[in-house]
Amino acid sequence: MAVPKKRTSISKKRIRKKIWKRKGYWTSLKAFSLGKSLSTGNSKSFFVQQNK
């Protein structure tokens, strides 16, 4: 079984964690933006049937 030879430094660990968190932030921002545009009816990429 593969075992890491040296311990990862704290700074490298923080950098990787920050990158991982930033990806989640941008994904959630895009999802919120898409939901907002769908609810207001300004979306150009989705076709939503309006129940009247």
Curated annotation (Swiss-Prot):
GO cellular component annotations of the record: chloroplast; large ribosomal subunit; plastid
Keywords: Chloroplast, Plastid, Ribonucleoprotein, Ribosomal protein
GO biological process: translation
SUPFAM superfamilies membership: Zn-binding ribosomal proteins
A Pfam family reported for this protein in Swiss-Prot or TrEMBL: Ribosomal_L32p
Annotated family: Belongs to the bacterial ribosomal protein bL32 family.
Protein's recorded name: Large ribosomal subunit protein bL32c
Source organism (scientific name): Arabidopsis thaliana
Encoding gene, per UniProt annotation: rpl32
